[in-house]
């Protein structure tokens, strides 16, 4: 029988032993204190997270994909982070992919037995044509989920680089992956409920990996989302504001530049800063491999120049 008590994520938290007698304020104070400890645990693994960013960027730049895979909360967090990449960074939904044991149904309803199948983890990657250009990131709070173990084993056999994110040190998935990221947020306020601190920690790390990788491949200029997709009124205005913020131009000029660029924010920025048409701006961006800073290097205008 599996001994869960050896996992810190399954142990009892001594600070919440009387959780059922606490007032509401005591409950939230205890949870907040424990959340702070969880956040602090990420500090110890920042060098590994930085390596993960570099590996993800390298995979994307060579035409590969990044796969997140997990079960339950871990799987849902991977799907959540992956699904935010297209609207935020203007990338294809096939570029960063979240896989959850049991498929889409498992996102809202538990699928019995799905996480216990190593073969399911392998087959989910096989069905998506995994290649050695790709990167696979396995997520499991316990660090032992069979679905993730099987996926990582298949990925390694395919020649992929692999990363494991677990909330226990010396985890099974960590030992099998090329890179182990193992923060230790400690026992949960509600014993074994890894949707809490363990989930928070995993989400923080995924935020860093996806954001950092997108910065590295040119999806960000300064600290602005210059590849944001303008899919609603708010994002249309945001696109205009970004062009205005970067170039110092008027809204009227930003609107026109975006129209000429087919709504592509980066092209609009470069066209204003280089005082060229959208086609020329697109060429400059292509030569710079999509990096705005490189495309406009030495050509930045003062606000007065671009009104």
Model feature map: region roles:
Residues 1-41, 45:
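Cofactor-/ligand-binding subdomain signature composed of acidic, glycine-rich
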Residues 30-38, 98-109, 262:
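Gly-rich Lys/Arg/Thr-decorated short loops/hinges at beta-loop-alpha junctions or inter-strand turns
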Residues 44-59:
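A short, well-structured juxtamembrane/interface segment
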Residues 55, 151, 209:
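Aromatic/hydrophobic pocket-lining residues that form π-stacking "cages" and hydrophobic walls in ligand
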Residues 61-62, 157:
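Residues at the C-terminal ends
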Residues 67-205, 213-217:
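Glycine-rich phosphate-binding loops that contact phosphosugars or nucleotide phosphates
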Residues 208, 213-307:
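Short, amphipathic alpha-helical interaction segments embedded in low-complexity terminal/linker regions
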């Amino acid at each position: 029988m599996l001994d869960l008590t050896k996992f810190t994520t399954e142990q009892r938290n001594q600070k919440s032993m009387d959780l059922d007698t606490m007032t509401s304020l005591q409950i939230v104070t205890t949870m907040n204190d424990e959340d702070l400890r969880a956040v602090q645990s990420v500090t110890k693994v920042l060098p590994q997270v930085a390596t993960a960013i570099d590996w993800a960027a390298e995979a994307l730049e060579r035409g590969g994909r990044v796969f997140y895979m997990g079960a339950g909360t871990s799987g849902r967090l991977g799907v959540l982070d992956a699904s935010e990449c297209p609207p935020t960074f203007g990338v294809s939904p096939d570029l960063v992919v979240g896989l959850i044991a049991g498929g889409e149904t498992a996102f809202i309803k538990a699928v019995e037995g799905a996480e216990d199948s190593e073969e399911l983890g392998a087959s989910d990657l096989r069905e998506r044509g995994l290649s050695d250009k790709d990167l696979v990131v396995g997520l499991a709070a316990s660090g032992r989920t069979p679905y993730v173990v099987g996926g990582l084993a298949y990925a390694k056999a395919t020649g992929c680089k692999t990363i494991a994110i677990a909330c226990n040190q010396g985890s099974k998935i960590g030992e099998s992956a090329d890179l182990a990221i193992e923060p230790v947020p400690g026992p949960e306020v509600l014993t074994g409920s890894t949707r809490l601190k363990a989930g928070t920690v995993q989400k923080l790390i995924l935020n860093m990996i996806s954001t950092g990788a997108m910065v590295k491949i040119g999806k960000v200029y300064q600290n602005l989302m210059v590849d944001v997709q303008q899919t609603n009124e708010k994002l249309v205005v945001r696109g205009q504001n970004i062009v205005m913020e970067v170039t110092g131009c008027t809204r009227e000029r930003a609107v026109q530049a975006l129209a000429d660029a087919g709504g592509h924010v980066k092209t609009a920025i470069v066209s204003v800063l280089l005082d060229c048409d959208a086609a020329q701006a697109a060429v400059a961006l292509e030569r710079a491999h999509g990096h705005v800073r490189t495309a406009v290097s030495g050509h930045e205008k003062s606000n007065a120049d671009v009104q």
